[in-house]
From Swiss-Prot:
Biased composition regions of type Polar residues, renumbered to the chain: 119-138
Region (Disordered): 119-139, 168-191
GO molecular function: protein transmembrane transporter activity
Subcellular location: Cell inner membrane
GO cellular component: TAT protein transport complex
Gene Ontology biological-process entries: protein transport by the Tat complex
Organism placement in taxonomy: Bacteria, Pseudomonadati, Pseudomonadota, Gammaproteobacteria, Pasteurellales
Assembly mode: The Tat system comprises two distinct complexes: a TatABC complex, containing multiple copies of TatA, TatB and TatC subunits, and a separate TatA complex, containing only TatA subunits. Substrates initially bind to the TatABC complex, which probably triggers association of the separate TatA complex to form the active translocon.
Keywords linked to the UniProt accession: Cell inner membrane, Cell membrane, Membrane, Protein transport, Translocation, Transmembrane, Transmembrane helix, Transport
Gene field: tatB
Protein name per its UniProtKB record: Sec-independent protein translocase protein TatB
Protein species of origin: Pasteurella multocida (strain Pm70)
Length: 191
């Protein structure tokens, strides 16, 4: 359909892995595949309806041609055939109109489902982001100068250094005064 080769597909997957990460990439792939399946289904519905409409139009044209040839001069067998064609054309028209009415409602429902699905996935993805990722996303939306980018990188390095010594579950930092009595006890034991 889009004439995408293996190399382009591989490049898209690598970029997706870098941008989304290994945790969110499968969710994004499933979401995109759902969209593609929905779009394919809608396209096949439209294609089938167009084919039926073309058949109906051809039948109507053949009926008009038969009427132009003076319907009374035809043999009784041909007149029966023309009547049958008219009846089948009318049946197809009513069936097509019913399907069109049903398709319009289902098309609107499918559009609403897609919108709801995209909103829910975007909400779950934002809920899954850690505060540092949200800060990073917020800062990447703005255009940053090289100096600002370097400053942000330094802040991130400092945060990593601090998080090594002060884990998230640790409410109070360990002060040097708490460490000194232990070293004095060790020195007393040596003496």
């Amino acid at each position: 359909m889009f004439d995408i080769g293996f190399s382009e597909l591989f490049l898209i997957l690598v970029i997706g892995l870098l941008v989304l990460g290994p945790k969110r990439l499968p969710v994004a792939i499933r979401t995109v595949m759902g969209w593609v399946a929905t779009i394919r289904g809608l396209a096949s519905n439209v294609q089938n309806e167009l084919k039926q409409e073309l058949k109906l139009q051809e039948l109507q044209e053949s009926i008009k041609k038969a009427e132009e040839l003076n319907f009374q001069q035809l043999s009784p067998e041909l007149s029966k055939t023309v009547e049958e064609l008219k009846a089948s054309a009318e049946k197809m028209r009513t069936a097509l109109e019913q399907k069109a009415a049903a398709t319009n409602t289902t098309l609107e429902e499918q559009i609403k489902e897609i919108k709801n699905a995209t909103e829910s996935t975007s909400q779950t993805l934002t809920e899954q982001l850690t505060p540092s990722e949200q800060v990073t996303e917020a800062t990447t939306d703005d255009v940053l100068s090289p100096a600002e980018q370097a400053e942000l990188a330094e802040e991130n390095d400092e945060m990593v250094y601090i998080q090594q010594y002060y884990p998230d579950d640790d409410d109070e930092p360990v002060f040097a005064s708490k460490v000194k009595p232990q070293t004095e006890e060790i020195q007393d034991k040596k003496a």
